[in-house]
Swiss-Prot record:
It comes from Campylobacter jejuni subsp. jejuni serotype O:6 (strain 81116 / NCTC 11828). Keywords: 2Fe-2S, Amino-acid biosynthesis, Branched-chain amino acid biosynthesis, Iron, Iron-sulfur, Lyase, Magnesium, Metal-binding. This is Dihydroxy-acid dehydratase. GO terms for biological process: isoleucine biosynthetic process; L-valine biosynthetic process. It is an enzyme of class 4 (lyase). Gene3D superfamilies: IlvD/EDD C-terminal domain-like. Functions in the biosynthesis of branched-chain amino acids. Catalyzes the dehydration of (2R,3R)-2,3-dihydroxy-3-methylpentanoate (2,3-dihydroxy-3-methylvalerate) into 2-oxo-3-methylpentanoate (2-oxo-3-methylvalerate) and of (2R)-2,3-dihydroxy-3-methylbutanoate (2,3-dihydroxyisovalerate) into 2-oxo-3-methylbutanoate (2-oxoisovalerate), the penultimate precursor to L-isoleucine and L-valine, respectively. Pathway: Amino-acid biosynthesis; L-isoleucine biosynthesis; L-isoleucine from 2-oxobutanoate: step 3/4; Amino-acid biosynthesis; L-valine biosynthesis; L-valine from pyruvate: step 3/4. It catalyses: (2R)-2,3-dihydroxy-3-methylbutanoate = 3-methyl-2-oxobutanoate + H2O; (2R,3R)-2,3-dihydroxy-3-methylpentanoate = (S)-3-methyl-2-oxopentanoate + H2O. Its cofactor is [2Fe-2S] cluster; Mg(2+). The keyword Protein transport does not apply. Homodimer.
């Protein structure tokens, strides 16, 4: 056992003495030691109940002859951190989470790992850390919350509240309606109820085979979710000493491809691109941002979920057959785009896992021949504005897929929010938000507040927004993020001026500023990088080490 390094032989008597102080008995030193990486925190609705979930898991581990050791990671709630300086810390928290998993698991030489994530950066951070450790690992998330319902009977989610801010600013809804939306949108614990970043990543864990069936869609705080926890705990005990189930044997090139196929079929959050690039790097798997358009071209978008379709939420997807039904439909209709021989954590191949899966409601999960789109729900655009690429969630577009407009430039998200409220962005404009990339922020803030303002003010179909920052999974509209190179590293987005003409063609995968080479060269000569004070030592360190979004915004030590 790996854990023999802390428990076997007379030289390890001091180690055992400390372990005895934690309650271990003689017989425990012959059992596998399993790390239970929890992410319990009171301020995140998807995490406040994870303490109880860890107790269920630890109890099941003990019943099955292993010794659990629980530890916690930090967590940031992107919705609560949104719209103020707190959002600077969201993406950097992914690195802290990864480092903490690696640190605890390797410092104590634990044999296996079960991770309990749920929201935002916590799932990818845990995946990155687990891949560094490379022991048998299972992920079992806290699960999605139920959708909210207004007094009028309309189904809503957190994204509805963000958009209601814009509607209230534009006097399109009353104060009473506004308060009703605020109080109704998040009715229970769990990750926010649509196909936002949390549920996207928990779904992709299922697609990669590192989580059990239902991980992405079974509601939080349900009996079914509790049974999933127990199954996961039993399984980690079965495989704790089996090297076939080391996480790098599960998250392979095939698994990463399967994740991106499901991402395209379900119109996942644009943040998944950022995270999967980072996860692939930790797994030693080749994934280039340029590869994603090929996958998208081969995968129909068959499940449209909030915020792209506000009548459908994760519990609806679960009732309709879940992620397995989506994968089964894609595999039966779209050739060999899915890698069906990929190994899953149960020991089954993906093909075996999907053998009984079927769509139970074609209004929720469509057949390929009735797809929302013949191509996937995400796209990577290239052009002089994004020579290294940028990301758009095509599933969330509500207007035209081809757009030409005049730039209205803002040098921060705060500046943009004030400008939008004051009416500086009009129909036909391209709202440009820059110096919000991984280095420029630093921290690559999400732009949910400005996109939701535009949507709520009725401009969602008539305005494009481009940024070197990123978006919440709750964003919809013609919103282009992750522009690379970013403004802070000399990207063209930093050279734009008000009134410059910008063209976006989603189906041609292009984004272009209509400027001559001579004009661009002249602007580069005149360009002076704005200086931004960064008081935080951690954010200054992050700023120095972080790569741009086209590489997953990972910390680059080379």
């Amino acid at each position: 056992m790996r854990s023999d390094a802390i428990k076997k032989g007379h030289l390890k008597a001091p180690n055992r003495s400390l372990l005895r102080a934690c309650g271990l008995k003689d017989e425990d030193f012959n059992k596998p030691f399993i790390g239970v990486a929890n992410s319990y925190i009171d301020i995140i609705p998807g995490h406040y109940f994870l303490n109880d979930y860890a107790k269920i898991i630890k109890d099941e581990i003990r019943k099955n002859g292993c010794v659990p050791f629980e530890f916690n990671t930090i967590g940031v709630d992107d919705g609560i951190a949104m719209g103020h300086e707190g959002m600077l810390y969201s993406l950097p928290s992914r690195e802290i989470i990864a480092n903490s998993i690696e640190t605890v698991m390797n410092a104590h030489q634990l044999d296996a790992l079960i991770c309990i994530p749920n929201c935002d950066k916590i799932t990818p951070g845990m995946l990155m850390g687990a891949l560094r450790v490379n022991v048998p690992t299972i992920f079992v998330s806290g699960g999605p919350m139920a959708s909210g319902v207004t007094k009028k009977g309309e189904k809503i989610s957190l994204s509805s509240v963000f958009e209601a801010v814009g509607a209230y600013e534009a006097k399109k809804i009353s104060e009473e309606e506004f308060k009703d939306i605020e109080c109704s949108a998040c009715p229970s614990g769990g990750s926010c109820s649509g196909m936002f970043t949390a549920n996207s990543m928990n779904t992709l864990c299922e697609a990669m085979g590192i989580a059990l069936e239902g991980n992405g869609t079974i509601l939080a705080l349900s009996k079914e979710r509790e049974e999933l926890l127990r199954k996961a705990a039993r399984r980690i005990c079965e495989i704790a000493l089996d090297e076939r189930f080391k996480i790098r044997n599960i998250i392979t090139q095939k698994a990463v491809r399967n994740a991106m196929v499901v991402d395209m079929a379900m119109g996942g959050s644009s943040n998944t691109v950022l995270h999967m690039l980072a996860i692939s790097r930790e797994a030693g798997v080749a994934l280039d941002i340029k590869d994603l358009n090929f996958i998208s071209s081969k995968v129909a978008h068959i499940a449209k979920i909030a915020p792209s379709l506000n009548s459908v939420y994760m519990d609806d997807v679960h009732k309709a057959g879940g992620v397995s039904a989506v994968m089964a439909e894609i595999s039966s209709r779209q050739g060999h785009i899915l890698e069906l021989d990929a190994l899953t954590i149960t020991g089954e191949s993906l093909k075996e896992r999907l053998k009984n899966a079927k769509i139970k409601d074609e209004n929720i999960i469509r057949k390929v021949d009735n797809a929302y789109s013949k191509v996937g729900g995400l796209a990577i655009l290239f052009g002089n504005l994004a020579e290294q690429g940028c990301v758009i969630k095509t599933a969330g577009i509500i207007g035209e897929r081809k757009f030409k407009g005049k730039a209205v430039c803002f040098n921060s998200q705060d500046e943009a929010i004030k400008g939008i409220i004051k009416g500086k962005v009009q129909k036909g404009n391209v709202c440009v938000i820059r110096y919000e990339g991984p280095k420029g922020g630093p921290g690559m803030q999400e732009m949910l507040s400005p996109t939701s303002l535009l949507m709520g003010m009725g401009l969602g179909a008539d305005v494009a927004l481009i940024t070197d920052g990123r978006f919440s999974g709750a964003t919809r509209g013609l919103s282009v993020g992750h522009i690379s190179p970013e403004a802070a590293e000399g990207g063209l987005i930093g050279l734009l001026k008000d009134g410059d003409e910008i063209e976006i063609d989603v189906d041609a995968y292009t984004i272009h500023a209509n400027l001559s080479e001579e004009e661009i060269t002249q602007r580069k000569k005149e360009f002076v990088l704005p200086q931004k004070e960064v008081p935080s030592r951690w954010l200054r360190m992050y700023q120095k080490l972080v790569s741009n979004a086209s590489k997953g915004a990972v910390l680059d030590m080379e």
